[in-house]
Amino acid sequence: MDLHSLLELGTKPTAPHVRNKKVILFDTNHQVSICNQIIDAINSGIDLGDLLEGGLLTLCVEHYYNSDKDKFNTSPVAKYLRDAGYEFDVIKNADATRFLDVSPNEPHYSPLILALKTLESTESQRGRIGLFLSFCSLFLPKLVVGDRASIEKALRQVTVHQEQGIVTYPNHWLTTGHMKVIFGILRSSFILKFVLIHQGVNLVTGHDAYDSIISNSVGQTRFSGLLIVKTVLEFILQKTDSGVTLHPLVRTSKVKNEVASFKQALSNLARHGEYAPFARVLNLSGINNLEHGLYPQLSAIALGVATAHGSTLAGVNVGEQYQQLREAAHDAEVKLQRRHEHQEIQAIAEDDEERKILEQFHLQKTEITHSQTLAVLSQKREKLARLAAEIENNIVEDQGFKQSQNRVSQSFLNDPTPVEVTVQARPMNRPTALPPPVDDKIEHESTEDSSSSSSFVDLNDPFALLNEDEDTLDDSVMIPGTTSREFQGIPEPPRQSQDLNNSQGKQEDESTNRIKKQFLRYQELPPVQEDDESEYTTDSQESIDQPGSDNEQGVDLPPPPLYAQEKRQDPIQHPAANPQDPFGSIGDVNGDILEPIRSPSSPSAPQEDTRMREAYELSPDFTNDEDNQQNWPQRVVTKKGRTFLYPNDLLQTNPPESLITALVEEYQNPVSAKELQADWPDMSFDERRHVAMNL
C-alpha cells in the first residue's frame, strides 16, 4: 500500500449510497387548472410540505412535456432523477379541478387541506406556468450568494426584460416577501433547479419568451460559486497549441503540489459532465474539494493574475496571510505582460517608427484596462458598503422600538418619578447630576448576540472588494461589533456622599469592563494610510493589544462637575428634543452660562464668576495637580491630536465634532460615525470620556 495514499483516504466514496425520496405527481384531465392552483398556493405563502417537490415537477412536466407522462418517463431528466434516488408516485383523479381534490387525505396534511380550502383561483392560462418557471429561473445566477444578492439580480433582470418588452411579471410577484419565498423554494428544491438547468441547456426548439429567459438565466449561472475553477483554467493552466502549460508564477515545487491536487479535484468534478459548471448550485458531489482554502497559494496567485488581465470577477477575498501574495502575483503578471508585448512588437515591427507607435498603443491599452478594472472594482466596493449600511440601519430600526420600550420600563422601575431624568421636568432647585455607570444590558443577551458586523472596505486597496459571483456579506472585510446598543444606561437618582463612598470601589470595577468594551467597538479601525504605520505600531498599538491599558493615562481628567443653569426655560414651552436622553438635551448650552455648584454627591467645585475664564490648552503630559483638576472647563488634546472642551463637549447630546470628522475623513468610515452618534446618548460619562480620549 502506498503510504501517501493515506492523505487521500476519505475524499472519495468507497460505498456510494443514494438516499431514496418519493415525489408525488398529479395527473388529471384539468392539468392546467391544477398547475395554476399550485402556483397560487405558492404565491399565497402556503407551505406545501412534502407535496412541494411533486407540485413543482408537475409544473415542469406540463410546461416541457405537455403532461405526457410516457414522454417524461423516457426522458433523460427522469433517468437522472431516478439515478439520484427519486421515485415517482402518480396520483390520478380524472375529474379533479382543484389542487385540494388531488391532495392526499392523510392526518399530517390536515393543515394544508384547511389552507387550500380558503384558496380561490381564477387563473386557468397555460402560459402562466411558463411565466412562473421563468420567474424562478431569475434567482439561479446568485442563488449560492444569498437572498439579498439573488433578489437584486432578479429585479435587475426583470427590469431588462420589461424594457425589452419580452415579459412583464405581476407586480405582487416583485414584492420582497414573495421573492424571498421563491428564493427559499429554489434553494431547497433540487428537482426544480435541475429541470430548469437541464432544459435551459438542451432545449433547442420550441422556444417561447419564457424558455428564452430560462436559457439566459442558466447561461449566467454557469460556474456560479466556481470562480477558482474558471480562473485557474483560464490563467494558470494555459492551453496552447502544444498542450497545457503552467503559468510561470506557479512553477515552484510547493505550488506545483497544490496544482496537482487541484487537477485531481477537477477530474472528479468533470465526471458530472454537462452539469459540472452548475455543481455549486446543484450541490453535486466533489464540490467541497474545490474550496479556495484548500489551495491557498494557487488561489491567491490565480486571482492576482486574473485581476492583472482585467477580470473584475476575481475580486473575492483571500486569506489575510495570502493577500500580499495575491498583490505580488498581480504586479508580476503586469510586468510579464509588458515584457511579452515588447517582445511581440520587436518581432512584428518593420521599423523604429512603427515600433514606437505600437509600444505607445500597448502601453495606453494596458493603462486604460487597468484603470477601468479599478473603476469597476471601486463601484463594487461602494455597492457593498451601501448594502452593509442598509442592513445595519434595518437592524437598528428593528431593535430601536424594543430598546426604547425597555428603557422606559426600566426607568419606571428605577425611579418612581422618571420624569426627573430629562431637563424639561426637573425641579427648579434640583441640580443636574451625572449618574454612575449602570449596566442595563438586555437580559439573556451576550456580547456576541448584541453585536453585529458592519462592512468597511479600504478604498486604497484594489483587491479588498466584492466579486459579482462571490459577493457574500459573510466573506467581506468586516469590523466586529459596531452597531449594537450594548449599553442602555438608565440614570439613577443622585446618592448621598456616604452611599457613594461605600459603593465607589464596586462601581469602578463594574464600569471598567463596560468602558473597555464600549471603546473596543471603535478602536478596530483600519489605518488611514498604509505607508504611515507609526501611529499604529508603537505605544498605541501595544495598548490596543492589551485591553487593560488606557490610552488616556497621560491625561488625568477631573471627575464630572454638577451644573445649574442660570437661564431656565419654561419646560412646557421648550421641551427637550430627545426625551430618551438620560443626560437631558443640553444641546446648545455653552460654558458661559454654566456655573459649578456644590453638591454632597459630587466633588466640590470652586466658586467662580458667572463668566468663566477662557479655556486653555491642556497638553497630554500635564501632571495630576489639584489646581488642574478644579479648573473647569479645559481644552483637552488627546494623543491622537483630537481637541475638545472638557467636560462641556461630553455633556452634549451629540459626540464632539472632532470625533465625527476623524471617523469620516481620517478613517474613511462613515458607518461608524453614524453608529457613534446613535450610541452617544446611551453612554455614561466615563464611557464618553474613554471613547473621546482613545479614538
Swiss-Prot record:
Residues 424-611 are annotated as: Disordered. This is Nucleoprotein. Residues 438-447 have a biased composition (Basic and acidic residues). Phosphorylated. Residues 495-505, 537-552 have a biased composition (Polar residues). Keywords: Capsid protein, Coiled coil, Helical capsid protein, Host cytoplasm, Host-virus interaction, Phosphoprotein, Ribonucleoprotein, RNA-binding, Viral budding, Viral budding via the host ESCRT complexes, Viral nucleoprotein, Viral release from host cell, Virion. This protein can be divided into a hydrophobic N-terminal half, and a hydrophilic and highly acidic C-terminal half. The coiled coil region is critical for homooligomerization, for the interaction with VP35 and for NP function in RNA synthesis. It comes from Lake Victoria marburgvirus (strain Musoke-80) (MARV). InterPro entries: Ebola_NP.
